[in-house]
């Protein structure tokens, strides 16, 4: 592949000058260029993150087909770092689809939270981009209603909010227009001045326009002096074929290192704490295998239905929406072997090994459900098919339970049960680890015939009210020998006073810093889809009808039979939580 080198136009070192200006006369090239000596031997390169936001100077590299391979792809391979102050670099964050709900409710508030905590670099700007016609002031008014300061830190809240909004701008354009992205590039350069510019694009848009946006941004609005990164929201296709095609299309314009596939569940506090709990506590790591763990449950439930999102949801269903990504990613993180280090690639390598070791899903190990209408006194709840955006007679599941198995030495024979559903009796997301019975239990007379009541259980509650608790057996005070099941409880809001950052805050900061540990690599994505695609095709070809369950119930009865088939009792239905 032939390459051409373009010198950084915003260098401060002497050697050459340039009179280049914007068409309004504003200079966008500094007067001087940087010339670095040619070396035939490799230098001592510095990779990763030198500090929270390490400024960089380097060349821009183009492939022989004319597409830019600048940014992370060069930065992370062999890019010499120079001693620049924080004032010499800037980060420009462009939210594509800024008028949508995700941008207004999650992305922009998360950016403000990072700014409030002084986690963003000194020089940054935020641009909203969408087809909606808005002015800068209209964007600021729109997002100001969704910005909040930390509950536990309200100092200078109004002033901080005002300063953040002053850095927010808007550009209206079509998603497939190179000219519109060239205009965005012009506006970005005006704000960036002569600093080394790093650019982050967040694609908060439907997946069918990902490639158009990436093409236009890569060709017309990528950085010529710093890195360029793109955050891609799920869904990443509907099956293995469409996902692979999306990846191939994106890689025409980006390298794998520039693509940050986000799964916001991996940014949740308790998911991050999972590895800490296991690998830094001797009491848990020796137990983390088939020898002591009887089953593991990954549970996601919502107490509301699709409520206006039925048109989108009906195209994907609960398996694609929750199980194939959120729950499967957590399963891989839970079950992986000890990585060589905490480096992103080492962790993701181990996750891929887990996914590739999983047994193909069987139809008899899957239960489907769909919520139906239900009346509770004076209040009535609609059925899924009552949603006007849902096609008549839809058999798209709003609930699913599945039993999965990992065919390796550590987990052979241990059922990993997933359960996800809408319009259930409670809102909950948790991991439940049920341990084996005590061999020859001396106190089995006290438990009667149901020895499941005597098993220990470790629970990591992701939402709501983050908590970790361990269920143990203990003696009730008194003269007799009466046993009771108790919880050793770590409730986060009671232990830690500070407000827990939102998952989007952590993931946005990681993307800015170039930390990929919580983002999904392309081979991870392929392995996840390879597991679920045959099942999804079989369900669609056979038109398997879901079992109906009342809105606000505990789900279809079939889920209980599935658990019983594998000698498991759902932990969230035991009634003692």
From Swiss-Prot:
Binding residue positions for D-glucose 6-phosphate: 234, 264-268, 302, 321, 422, 427, 463
UniProt-annotated stretches for the region Disordered: 1-20
Gene Ontology cellular component annotations, sorted alphabetically: chloroplast
Subcellular location: Plastid, Chloroplast
Regulation (activators, inhibitors): Regulated by metabolites. Post-translationally inactivated by cysteine-mediated redox modification via the ferredoxin-thioredoxin system in the light and this avoids futile cycles with photosynthetic CO2 fixation.
Sequence ranges of Low complexity compositional bias: 11-20
Enzyme class: oxidoreductase
Catalytic activity: D-glucose 6-phosphate + NADP(+) = 6-phospho-D-glucono-1,5-lactone + NADPH + H(+)
Result of changing residue 168 to S: No effect on redox regulation
Keywords: Carbohydrate metabolism, Chloroplast, Disulfide bond, Glucose metabolism, NADP, Oxidoreductase, Plastid, Transit peptide
Pathway: Carbohydrate degradation; pentose phosphate pathway; D-ribulose 5-phosphate from D-glucose 6-phosphate (oxidative stage): step 1/3
Tissue specificity note: Green tissues, leaves and chloroplasts.
Record-given protein name: Glucose-6-phosphate 1-dehydrogenase, chloroplastic
Organism: Solanum tuberosum
């Amino acid at each position: 592949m032939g390459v051409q080198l373009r010198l950084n136009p915003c260098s401060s070192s002497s050697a050459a000058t340039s009179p280049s200006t914007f068409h309004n006369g504003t200079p966008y090239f500094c007067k001087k260029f940087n010339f670095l000596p040619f070396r035939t031997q490799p230098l001592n390169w510095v990779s990763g993150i030198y500090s929270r936001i390490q400024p960089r100077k380097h060349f821009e590299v183009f492939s022989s087909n004319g597409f830019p391979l600048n940014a992370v792809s060069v930065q992370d391979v062999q890019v010499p770092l120079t001693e620049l102050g924080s004032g010499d670099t800037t980060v420009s964050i462009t939210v594509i689809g800024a008028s949508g709900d995700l941008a207004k409710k999650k992305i922009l508030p998360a950016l403000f939270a990072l700014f409030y905590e002084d986690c963003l670099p000194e020089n940054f700007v935020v641009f909203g981009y969408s087809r909606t016609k808005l002015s800068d002031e209209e964007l600021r008014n729109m997002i100001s209603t969704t910005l909040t300061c930390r509950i536990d830190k309200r100092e200078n809240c109004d002033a901080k909010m005002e300063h953040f909004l002053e850095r927010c701008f808007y550009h209206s354009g079509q998603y497939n227009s190179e000219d519109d992205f060239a205009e965005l590039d012009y506006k970005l350069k005006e704000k960036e001045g002569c600093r080394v510019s790093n650019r982050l694009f967040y694609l908060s848009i439907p997946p069918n326009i990902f490639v158009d946006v990436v093409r236009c941004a890569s060709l017309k609005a990528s950085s010529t002096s710093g890195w360029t990164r793109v955050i891609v929201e799920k869904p990443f296709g509907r099956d293995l074929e469409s996902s692979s095609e999306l990846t191939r299309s994106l890689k025409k314009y980006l390298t794998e290192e520039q693509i940050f596939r986000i799964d916001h569940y991996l940014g949740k506090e308790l998911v991050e704490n999972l590895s800490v709990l296991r690998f830094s506590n001797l009491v848990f790591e020796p137990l983390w295998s088939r020898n002591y763990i009887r089953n593991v449950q990954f549970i996601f439930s919502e107490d509301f239905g699709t409520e206006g999102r039925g048109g989108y949801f009906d195209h994907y269903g609960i398996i694609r929406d929750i199980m194939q990504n959120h729950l499967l990613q957590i399963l891989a993180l839970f079950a992986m072997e000890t990585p060589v280090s905490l480096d992103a690639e080492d962790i993701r390598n181990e996750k891929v090994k887990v996914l590739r070791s999983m047994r193909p899903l069987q139809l008899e190990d899957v239960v489907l459900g769909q919520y139906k209408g239900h009346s509770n006194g004076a209040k009535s709840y609609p059925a899924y098919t009552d949603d006007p955006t849902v096609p008549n007679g839809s058999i798209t599941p709003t609930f699913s339970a599945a039993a999965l198995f990992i065919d390796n030495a550590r987990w052979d024979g241990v059922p990993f049960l997933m359960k996800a559903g809408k319009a259930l009796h409670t809102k909950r997301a948790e991991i439940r680890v049920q341990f084996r019975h005590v061999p020859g239990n001396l106190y089995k007379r006290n438990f009667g015939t149901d020895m499941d009541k005597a098993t220990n259980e470790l629970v990591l509650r992701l939402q709501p009210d983050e908590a970790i608790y361990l269920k143990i057996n203990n003696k009730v005070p008194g003269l007799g020998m009466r046993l009771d099941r108790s919880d050793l409880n770590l409730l986060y809001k009671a232990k830690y006073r500070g407000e827990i950052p939102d998952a989007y805050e952590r993931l946005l900061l990681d993307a800015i810093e170039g930390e990929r540990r919580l983002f999904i690599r392309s081979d991870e994505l392929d392995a996840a889809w390879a597991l679920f695609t045959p099942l999804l095709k079989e369900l669609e070809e056979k038109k398997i009808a879901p079992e109906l369950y009342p809105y606000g119930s505990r789900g279809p009865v079939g889920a209980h039979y599935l658990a019983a088939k594998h000698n498991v009792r759902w932990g969230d239905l035991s009634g003692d939580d």
